[in-house]
């Protein structure tokens, strides 16, 4: 239905802005073309929503977001606020702002989503702009970008679980941005809820006043009506001047087949209308605005966006190249470039986990490239580099902020674009310190220095570490410490922030963290632990490249840089697993795992054997020996010149999780 409405909007555009409605009456109606000229937009009567927004001064704008640990009820609370303001109908709505299929399937927020709301407080209309942010650490770049368009935040805590690792991380992010924080305790209707404990934790951990907290149940709607007056009273209005030249920040973008790239923008000064000519500070490219509007909660066209507002725009002619939309870029009107100081933009997040992606069918490479580029438009924290493999053909090396980020991106490629892909296991970057003093960070295991180069030219190898913050009940302390120590961890601090809850800090190698550490942590604590982490620099490490050899020929698609303590275990696992997926040949196939020049594991696949003694008389011993020797020599020759053909499906099965 939404797509139909957008198509109707597109088709109903008629006159150029320079033409008047009166001038069109000179021509007979039947001679008028039904196709819209470029840069055209019909002047529709202002809707009731638009009329109400036009009457609201910037002093009655409020831009705020909801931040919390994953699964503490942010999206459900967003639904209740949208219902309370009449933005959506009550009852049948579940996670309206979780618009991706993968979000609804997994029950998590992946993309920060925005929505404008109108709310009447004490007889005056207020324009509220809500951002529902992700809770998981892998999507922190989304959270930090959201803060740029907000003046305050609702800090949400689950009454039954209390403060958890990402609550702490999100608090410090918001605090560093100078946001006004409103404490909210959610899920107070649960039998296991302990609101007083959550309030005490907020006071002790964040020094937030328990008296200012609002206790709600987003599921039942209990006390949710108290939140919006609290937002109006405590969160400051945005600062901006609509009479100044346009200064507009690009916060996010996505791709539409019919409209090209659509931009989500925050206006700091000035205003923007259909037909305005704007220019990008980052690229210098100029565009004509085709439509402006707000998310209410879906795209709702408006005649103007003013300073203080957050809304969407797209251009006519459309912005077709996704690379032109640089998140954090500043736009202004053509001619005002020297009058406007560009905004600082956003800090580029660093990719911490890398995978290689290849199409199952090599002819699908162009489709895979288009699909990845469209998803990157909507997720700028992904890095992209082309690469090729002898075994799997042309593909890409993709960088992500974490393993969940990688998994969600893979799901979106399959679901939204129908991509059939082979994904290699995640790896982390490593640093090479050369003897001439140069440092090089390498993300592709295939580029790891060879044994001779290591001895002659390399001073040391380093791997990245992270500072992990773990929160869990005190009864699991022994198991968690044991898990961290077995993953080469180094304890940094241990504190009790309640009599039963522990905050444990460990420095861990990032390589161990991406090797399903969170799954093992959940298993050790029966699901009660939470994890957050931040970069902690590089450390000298005894690492080497583990690779798979088939008849002494390296398989370039299967290689990984690992710590020496993992070489034996991984090597044995690789050869036994790969053996299952390689077909028998007319000669013996030897599968080896090697770290440098040392073979650490080996498996053999026996050849098909022809019975050369079938027609031989039983008593002819010398003839028997001669035939067997001849067969043996033939096998040696075949093994020396024969190539092992490994099918695509073998790699697919081997690399499957």
UniProtKB/Swiss-Prot annotation:
SUPFAM superfamilies: EF-G C-terminal domain-like (SSF54980), P-loop containing nucleoside triphosphate hydrolases (SSF52540)
GO molecular function: GTP binding; GTPase activity; mitochondrial ribosome binding
Topological category with respect to the lipid bilayer: Peripheral membrane protein
Ranges where the tr-type G domain occurs: 59-239
A GO-annotated cellular component: mitochondrial inner membrane
BP GO terms, sorted: positive regulation of translation; translation
Protein keywords: GTP-binding, Hydrolase, Membrane, Mitochondrion, Mitochondrion inner membrane, Nucleotide-binding, Protein biosynthesis, Transit peptide
Positions bound to GTP: 109-116, 173-177, 227-230
Localization: Mitochondrion inner membrane
Enzyme class, spelled out: hydrolase
Function: Promotes mitochondrial protein synthesis. May act as a fidelity factor of the translation reaction, by catalyzing a one-codon backward translocation of tRNAs on improperly translocated ribosomes. Binds to mitochondrial ribosomes in a GTP-dependent manner.
UniProt similarity note: Belongs to the TRAFAC class translation factor GTPase superfamily. Classic translation factor GTPase family. LepA subfamily.
Protein name: Translation factor GUF1, mitochondrial
Origin species: Ajellomyces capsulatus (strain NAm1 / WU24) (Darling's disease fungus)
Originating gene: GUF1
